[in-house]
Amino acid sequence: MSTAVRYYSRGGKTKEVAEYLAQAAGVQAVSVDTQAAAIKEPVDVLFVGGALYAYGLDKHLSSWLDDLDAKMVKKAVLFSTSWISKHALDLMREKLTAKGIPVEEKTLYLKSKEAAGSRQTAEAFAKQFL
């Protein structure tokens, strides 16, 4: 099963969770603000993560989702960290489903203060889809 992990993080919490998910999947977590983030080969599971910034997704993540080729992704699984709101999960889901990419109902949401030391939680979450 092929897997990829993509994320955008300003403060490092979402990056930390992305790296835990990637370790569980045996892949590298890649920030969407890098050229390496492009999905060039089809993946069965794409973990996508981000947070809410000023009531929306960061422009890097939003743009990357807009450019994502739906034919390259069999299913997306969402994760997010934030201080107060899970709304980033809804916004990512909307963008992906609008492209015709199936999105897993289960998501991983951690409040920012919970992200540190969340390795076991993130790995257990990832293993459900691998």
Each language-model region and where it sits:
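FMN-binding flavodoxin-like domain, especially the glycine-rich phosphate-binding loop
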Residues: 3-4, 9-16, 20-30, 40-130
